[in-house]
């Protein structure tokens, strides 16, 4: 393949303005790198509803979407159509492309390609709620202990089979961390190359003078486990700032004591400044990689986090002093 003359497509699962996170940041950067070094890729996703400001990242190019885009609430609530996702991603027509690059945490890896096309997939995670996080997902849903729990379990069982099959479709798999690579090996029985996501650490500056507050930056969704952080700080009575938005925000505000404040939409804050001033950065989620903790360390803030997942790739935690090595955080076991 002549890469300089290749026609390229870039596929991500979806772009939902309320839940843009690390996977979307990686996709934006992939688009930038491909556009600067080769030709602008055509963009595909199951659905999109990004804002005009976010749309400028893609130089106002069209994002080709699936049939879910035209269904009621498909743009905003794509996961309501979970049973349709495998079917929908397979309907994207990529026949005219030489190189397909997918950025996948659920479905993008599952696009259909021909033997003469090259498909490289950057895997953020195998489908979480089809594998090791299935029971957690069900417990946090409104369907636990209802008549619909069994149909939900059957759906996840079928999705697990599709996730395994579709994981074998790309020609090359790239994992975002050792943790993700191990999950790919366990669930798909495949090898993968680990390339950590790029993090723009130039945005952040080290500051040795710290103020008396702790910081957590997350999308406020169940798997980030911000509720555990709140419960801990309710007990400790230490000042905590939580930055983020998401469907869990009102629920989390209700359980937070007065020592905890929230910054998000409608509030004036600067993440870079908060990271440069906080005493430490607190993170409770089991991350596939975890961009926010890397940004915190770039600002000189030590990380207090769970010793599982992607944090094991990035946080140096030494219980005993080591020559020429410094700790960048504390990782707790559970």
Residue spans of the language-model regions?
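Acidic anion/phosphate-binding donor-loop and adjacent secondary structure
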Residues: 182, 186, 190-194, 198-212
